[in-house]
Design a protein with these regions (language model features):
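A detector for short metal-coordination/catalytic motifs
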Residues: 1-2, 12-97
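Acidic/histidine-rich
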Residues: 9
Length: 97
């Protein structure tokens, strides 16, 4: 999905003996109680460590794509149309300030 398995938060690309590895992370979690959509606009390509930190609410994203809880800005391609609604949901319901 994103730049050949490169983490959109850290920029890390994990290479394994079986090839590159990254994880698809839902911005607004799917299933109850969050009911996020299982769509590309609700997915980030993350390293395993960043995936866990994002899911646990240690990291989130501002509307301008700057990161919260870690310094930096989300790496994104023009064709990856992220859901601002999902980003806002994560920040307001998952992120722990």
């Amino acid at each position: 999905m994103y730049d050949y398995y490169t983490c959109q938060i850290s920029g890390v690309k994990l290479d394994t003996p079986n090839g590159p590895y990254a994880e698809a992370c839902h911005i607004q979690p799917v299933g109850k109680p969050h009911n996020g959509p299982d769509e590309v606009s609700n997915v980030l390509c993350l390293s395993p460590n960043m995936h866990v930190l994002f899911d646990l609410g240690a990291i989130s994203i501002n509307d301008d794509l700057t990161l919260i809880g870690i310094e930096g800005i989300l790496n994104i391609r023009d064709e990856h149309d992220l859901s601002q609604e999902a980003i806002r949901y994560h920040r307001e319901n998952i992120f722990i300030n």
